[in-house]
Amino acid sequence: MSLKVLVIPEDPTYNGAILEPLIKRMLAECGKPQAKVLVLTDPKVNGFDHACARMVSIAERYAHFDFLLFLPDNDGQNRAVGLRRLEERVAQSGVRLLCCAAIEEVETWLLAGHRSKLQQDWRQVRQDVSVKENVFTPFLEQFGNRKESSGGRRRLMKEALRNYHSVTQLCPEIGDLEGRIKAGFAEIGT
């Protein structure tokens, strides 16, 4: 039986194009290269608050998945306590929800694999709460492709993942999520 993982982004079109290849690679690194990864599009959520408000109903609808991963932007907030509570609330229905907020935005994870192309110090990129507007948008204009459905995000993320271990070092929350997924494998016996 193949492992099934649902990725819940704040935006399935653009963030989903970054997160799907990342989670596939992460699961391969965890020894699950055949895992099925689905990005949530139904119901389509729009932003952090909307996703949180719908999470219990999403969990009920997708309870047949082995893991649900909610991967929002941190947006300069300290989301850890709220995300932990959300995990606990969903766990009451027997569903495994793991949350991981991208510091500061999901686009940062893509940028980590292209650090040599950036014109800024990496610490500044990581600390910029408007990294999408200040760093990622100019990067995408230069290296993306408007003709691609995701503007080039999927391709750029796949390129970034050639340096997966560097990405996990530059964005330690990704490594933490990987560790939590491995621990979850032990719980479900895979």
Please annotate each region the language model reported.
Residues M1-V5, T13-T190:
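C-terminal accessory helical subdomains adjacent to catalytic cores in phosphodiester-
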